[in-house]
């Protein structure tokens, strides 16, 4: 017997001056259901375009009968083509999606937005992160070591950065009663452990209450990124009814619009206000250390300023050396 899921989404700009995430949870014309999260990068007038275009293409491709992985491939192609336009260079997006087809579901992802399966027995991450941290941990580094690296915000795959991208797909898996598919951007899970995500979900009333409460908590816990959730709950995941410990609805203060206003004053809206991310490449085992060449990977939202600082320090060092030699 098919279990009809209850759907919910929640997304806020948080402490960022603009929103680059996109979320959806909707039924397709053939009765299948798609839930997805995309986290754009590229700055004002670029990151939001990338995530929105990736989502739009995903839905169109699924409506046309394409498989989930093929829909991601088409999304990558369209975003990459769009990135050739003035002011859009270097834009890209992560994307994670689940398609529920009757009694089964399938998951696909590119980047580090995540899909979890929540149930009475805990939480399991279905998707795999395409990031420096994830790759470093696969090669034996501890999570603490990987997160202390200056490359901790670097992505190894992204929608739209390269002409082609490898898409990871998972499933199909059977839909089980009293479980939930929980998709989120890194703005949420970077301030919460997996256990914390399951705990907070269990304290919230229904999918809508869970989405609102968890976005609110991530914001209050200091997330400095856009925060987004899309979920589908089958039946009802076991919950702790101590509702007084969690807010049911939270509206954060509006983001500071000064960055947008400054960009609008006599400037071309198509010009991004952050540097474009370099292209991604496959790395061998020797690259995952502190000598790793960051110029060969996609840089996620928080990492671009760090890379610019590294380059700037190097240039300053060269200039000072030349001046010293001339004086001598």
Residue ranges and their predicted role:
Residues 1-328:
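PP2C/PPM-type serine/threonine phosphatase catalytic domain
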């Amino acid at each position: 017997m098919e279990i009809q899921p209850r759907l919910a989404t929640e997304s806020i700009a948080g402490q960022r001056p603009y929103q680059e995430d996109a979320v959806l949870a909707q039924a397709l014309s053939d009765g299948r259901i798609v839930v997805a999260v995309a986290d754009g990068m590229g700055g004002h007038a670029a990151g939001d375009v990338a995530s929105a275009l990736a989502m739009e293409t995903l839905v169109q491709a699924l409506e046309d009968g394409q498989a989930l992985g093929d829909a991601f491939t088409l999304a990558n192609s369209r975003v990459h083509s769009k990135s050739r336009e003035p002011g859009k260079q270097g834009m890209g997006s992560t994307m994670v999606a689940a398609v529920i087809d009757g009694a089964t579901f399938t998951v696909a992802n590119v980047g580090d937005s995540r899909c979890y399966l929540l149930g009475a027995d805990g939480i399991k991450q279905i998707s795999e992160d395409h990031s420096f941290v994830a790759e470093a941990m696969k090669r034996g580094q501890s999570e603490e070591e990987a997160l202390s690296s200056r490359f901790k915000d670097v992505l190894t795959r992204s929608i739209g950065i390269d002409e082609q991208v490898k898409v990871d797909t998972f499933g199909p898996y059977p839909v089980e009663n009293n479980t939930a598919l929980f998709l989120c951007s890194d703005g949420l899970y970077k301030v919460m452990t997996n256990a914390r995500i399951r705990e907070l979900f269990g304290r919230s009333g229904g999918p809508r209450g869970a989405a609102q409460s968890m976005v609110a908590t991530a914001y209050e816990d200091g997330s400095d990124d856009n925060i987004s959730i899309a979920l589908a709950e089958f039946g009802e995941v076991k919950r702790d009814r101590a509702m007084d410990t969690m807010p049911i609805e939270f509206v954060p203060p509006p983001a500071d619009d000064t960055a947008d206003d400054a960009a609008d004053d006599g400037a071309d809206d198509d010009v991004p206000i952050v540097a474009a991310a370099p292209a991604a490449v496959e790395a061998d085992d020797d690259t995952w250390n502190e000598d790793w060449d960051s110029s060969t990977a996609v840089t996620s939202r928080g990492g671009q300023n760090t890379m610019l600082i590294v380059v700037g320090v190097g240039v300053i060092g060269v200039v000072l050396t030349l001046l010293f030699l001339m004086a001598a």
